[in-house]
């Protein structure tokens, strides 16, 4: 039977298709991201998987930043081979390498900013321009930045990933992920999301909502602490500091 319309919006007739608690979290993140819609997944890597499988098909190619989060590399470089999906990597410090990697089979540009392993910052506007010029889909892992610092969909990306396990949660007691999308890719992601069953449970959604209440306070303190730690380590002769806000660094 048709589920009754919930007062806060939507039909809730089957838990895997959404609950009132996950709906509230989606609306909170939608406002933060300034996007068309936000999908919720059980883990951050679930959002990585969903973003790729929503738009990439056998015979397509992906261009990803090198290095990327190691599980993402394992997925793109190894696992996807069995689906006849090829991944090539570009140097995030030289976007000319990105342009040179594009072929007629290229479907998706996968970006991390900053990079998970070595914290490179990239010219995101230029990447978006390259993607649009070549009619490619674009996705960015924005876990480090979160929409508190960066709003990728507003900037021009098609999809934006955040591992809610990290800063959104803030208490090390919940796993989850979010995938913000624009209108262009909404139907692709919605279809894949329903079929794969990558849905966040209401209890986890509740804990993430709790964490979001202090997100700004925690990130401001993280920023202050990082500057102090970086300043200390920069004076250590046996430490190589990969910190983008250090004077003289490539990304300063």
Stretches found by the model and what they are:
Residues 1-46, 74-78:
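Conserved N-terminal alpha-helix of the aminotransferase class I/II PLP-enzyme fold
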Residues 37-236, 248:
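Conserved PLP-enzyme active-site core in the AAT-like
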Residues 241-252:
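Conserved PLP-binding catalytic core of the aspartate aminotransferase-like
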